[in-house]
Amino acid sequence: DLDGRTNILNLNAIGETACTGLHGANRLASTSLLECLTSAHFTALADSQDIARKAFSLPQPRLWESPPEEADPTLIAQDLDLVQQTMWNYAGIVRSPRRLTRARRILHEAREEIRSFYRRCRVTPELIELRNAVRSALLVVHAASLNPRSKGAHYVINERR
């Protein structure tokens, strides 16, 4: 409707997604912006009225128990260093299929160790950083494995000996 309500309770839509037909079929960028601002204004007014008469409430989040164990900061720092050194040594500027294979193996082991941290330890920003680092490293190694050519700043060595 013109207040942005949808058929899903407590979900509003504004702008073109609201399908108000405010400007008809002539869709210009300038009218789309105007429609967005206008519908947002009316939706906000309707929402404030709903909140004032308590017709709207946020669901309470479910509580869960956080694991009591904290991950050892030394282990997290060491694993992060392992990821960085692995990338530097095996997936750096000079690459080879053998080095990339070794990097992949090391990173897969690290990923499993980090998964065990997640299962038994409280999640911290450092643990999230470590998880993201190993995921990113695995993506880089995978992409590098798919590119056998020397291109840009990376040089692929041929290991025929």
Stretch-by-stretch model annotation:
Residues 1-13, 17-161:
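Glycine- and aromatic-enriched mobile tails/lids
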